[in-house]
C-alpha cells in the first residue's frame, strides 16, 4: 500500500485471485465490466468465461481505443473498468488518465493491473486510477520463489454515489456493518478483506508472504537493472536485420513511447516483445538455441527467460482474440533479467545466428 500510495492492501494467493476479488468486491450477477482486450490470457478468460458464467457481462475494448469508443462501451449496469498499465505480452501502454476519466464520468472505479511496471516505475493512483492489482509472483518477488497477488485501494473513490449499496447499506453477514461509514476511505479494501477473503479463502501462505517481503527489499535496485538491460537489448534487436519487428516502449520508434514517457518516465519494465524474420518456425529455433536464457512460462524474473505466448499463455484464445490482444503468431516475449548485459546479448546473438541460417 505504501509503495502504491494507497490506504490499504490485501495480499492474495495469486495474481488471478487478486483480479477476481478486485472485481467481485463491487460486481455481482447482473453487472457489467469494461475491460481492455490486451490483457494476460488468464485474465481475458476470467472475464470472457468465468465471470460470464457467474452472470457478469464484459465488453472488451482495444487499449488503443479513442475516448468516444471507450465511452460507448459503458452500460447502465457497468460496475468498473479494468486494464493493464503495460499489457502482457503486447506491451501496449494504456492511457491511464483516459480510462480513469471515462470510468469516473460513468460513476464507476478504474481498476488497473500494475504488475509489469511495478510502483517503482508507475504509480497509477497519481493518474486517477482507483484500485491497483498485482501478481506479486512477478517483479515484486523477483526470484520466482513464491506465488501471490495483491489488491491496493487508493481510498479516493466515492462509494456514496448511489451505485454501490454494498458499501452504504448494512452487511447482514457481518453484524450489519456499513463499510463506507465504519471504514471511510478504506471501505473498499476492508470489504474485500472482511467479506471476500472470508468466503473465498484465497489468502497468501505465510512462507509466500515472507519471500515476498524479502524480494521487495531489492525491488528498486532490480527494476533499475531490468530496465537498463532491456533498453540495451531492445536497441540491439531494433538494428539487427534478422529481426522483423521490436516492441519496447523505451524505444523512440515505439508507438507507445510518448505515453511511456508520460506514465513511466524512469523506465517501463524488463519485458520486450519481438518477431524474427521467418515467423513462428524461426521463433521456435531461436528459443531452442538459447543457452543462458530459459524457455519458461514465467516472466519478470531476475533471470532472463523467453516464451512464445500464442502457444502457451494465450493458447486457449481464438485467432481473432489473439489478434485483439496483440499476440501475433511470431511474437516472442523476452523477459530480460539482471545478468551482465553483454552475456545476455551474446546469447541472443548466437541464437539468432542459428535460427536464421
Where do the PLM segments sit?
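Conserved C-terminal alpha-helix-loop-beta "cap" of PLP-dependent enzymes
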Residues: 223, 231, 237-238, 242-332, ...
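Conserved PLP-enzyme active-site core in the AAT-like
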Residues: 8-239
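PLP-dependent amino-acid enzyme catalytic core
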Residues: 1-5
